[in-house]
Amino acid sequence: MFVGREQELASLEEFYAKDGIGMTVIYGRRRIGKSTLITEFVKDKKTVFYTATKIGKARNLELFSKQVLDLFMPGIENISFNSIEAVFDFIDKNIANDKIVLVIDELPYWAEKDDSLLSILQKYIDTIWNDKNLKIILCGSALSFMENKVLSEKSPLFGRRDSQIKLEAFNYLDSAKFVPDYSNEDKAICYGITGGVAKYLSMIDPKKNIDENLSLIHISEPTRH
């Protein structure tokens, strides 16, 4: 069940509606619901959705390439790419007149292993994809990296983004939507325990009572309101 985030979805739809190349940045602390928001947004769109991991440059390239092939040439497994430029060139040649969303989730994991990734991405946005209907979403949980390496004036990508979203915890009203049949008191308890963090709210079964749900929620870090 997807709950709330109407303003963020509207912003993303506005971003998507514009023709041409575009880039947006979504960031926020872990478990806040960034990936869920993006998944909801792209559910009816042609999308390459890659979630980077701490596995090194070569392995991220390999797995990203598979996601690209799955969109443009599903079922084809005998194509390999020896560089990120080769994958980006493949996207350029196959995008045609389609509008494609390109998501790189947990970007810092990859970019920290490949110092050239952001500058290569900047080159393609400026000179190669500039006439394509390609919508790029860069997402990350490492706030310092996203703010200093992606959003700051020192970033190769500075001036390229159309918008940005810093995703925060749900407020009380949106948190209450996860348990619509609860009393106001129990809704307040749920909000107080979860801090509006999407991951914890998603663990709640609205068919169970408050005590049953609280016994299922094991919060491993303190929440902040």
Predicted regions and their residues:
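Conserved lysine of the Walker
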Residues: K34
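Conserved small helical "lid"/interfacial subdomain of P-loop NTPases
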Residues: D162-K187
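Conserved P-loop NTPase "ATPase switch" module shared by AAA+ and STAND
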Residues: I95-L117, L121
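N-terminal pre-P-loop "Q-motif" helix
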Residues: M1-L12
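Sensor-1/coupling segment of RecA-like P-loop NTPase cores
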Residues: W110-K113, Y124-K154
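Short glycine-rich substrate-engagement loop in P-loop NTPases that contacts/grips substrate
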Residues: L71-K93
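Conserved NTP-binding/hydrolysis module of P-loop NTPases
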Residues: D44-V48, A58-E77
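Residue-level detector of conserved catalytic or cofactor/ligand-binding positions
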Residues: L214-H225
